[in-house]
UniProtKB/Swiss-Prot annotation:
InterPro entries: GTP-CH-I_C/QueF, GTP-CH-I_N, GTP_CycHdrlase_I, GTP_CycHdrlase_I_CS, GTP_CycHdrlase_I_dom. It catalyses: GTP + H2O = 7,8-dihydroneopterin 3'-triphosphate + formate + H(+). The gene is folE. One of its GO terms (cellular component) is cytoplasm. Its EC number is 3.5.4.16. Pfam families: GTP_cyclohydroI. Transmembrane segments: none annotated. This is GTP cyclohydrolase 1. Belongs to the GTP cyclohydrolase I family. Homomer. Keywords: GTP-binding, Hydrolase, Metal-binding, Nucleotide-binding, One-carbon metabolism, Zinc.
Length: 184
């Protein structure tokens, strides 16, 4: 029979020589398993469930920007967190996405094992697909604990990734407007 996640955590902790019966570690394997399940809960969600018909008709074709959306994810290489914020912009063509759904799309993908570059593109392509937007821009900036706690141990480094689709890629003035709105 396959071991439970809590049993796997117990084995991992025991492999360090720790005593699972000491007061500070009693229950830790179960808590760690519950935390990991939450941190990877994006695998159990679909775009359809997250968006949940929150697309609304709109005559606006002006840029929509949501910035400073907090996020956390687990790097697929070391399973250590990266923590940061996302900035999303899009140009609607007849419909707009409910504001909270932008954040929920980010959370759905962030709660999976992956890399920041992939997360950025997943968010951009999903918003483009769901809204039919003329263009989408996504920028994510994050600190990676895999670089801060181990390896080169650089605590002040920030990684920035971007995905520009449609008019955000093809039109310099659209991209410039997006970047200017992020800096105000």
């Amino acid at each position: 029979m396959k071991p439970t996640p809590a049993e796997l955590y117990a084995n991992l902790i025991s492999s360090t020589g720790e005593d699972l019966q000491r007061p500070g570690l009693q229950g830790t394997p179960a808590r760690a398993a519950t935390a990991f399940e939450y941190l990877t809960s994006g695998y159990k969600q679909s775009v359809q469930e997250v968006v949940n018909d929150a697309l609304f008709p709109s005559d606006s074709n002006d840029m929509v920007v949501v910035r400073d959306i907090e996020l956390f994810s687990l790097c697929e290489h070391h399973m250590l967190p990266f923590i940061g914020k996302a900035h999303v912009g899009y140009i609607p063509t007849g419909k707009v996405l409910g504001l909270s759904k932008v954040a929920r799309i980010i959370d759905m993908y962030a709660r999976r094992l992956q890399i920041q570059e992939q997360l950025t593109h997943q968010v951009a392509s999903t918003i483009a697909e769901v809204t039919g937007a003329a263009g989408v821009g996504v920028i994510i900036e994050a600190k990676h604990l895999c670089m801060m706690m181990r390896g080169v141990e650089k605590q002040n480094s920030v990684m920035k990734t971007s995905a520009m689709l449609g008019s955000f890629r093809a039109n310099l003035s659209t991209r410039s407007e997006f970047l200017a709105l992020l800096n105000n």
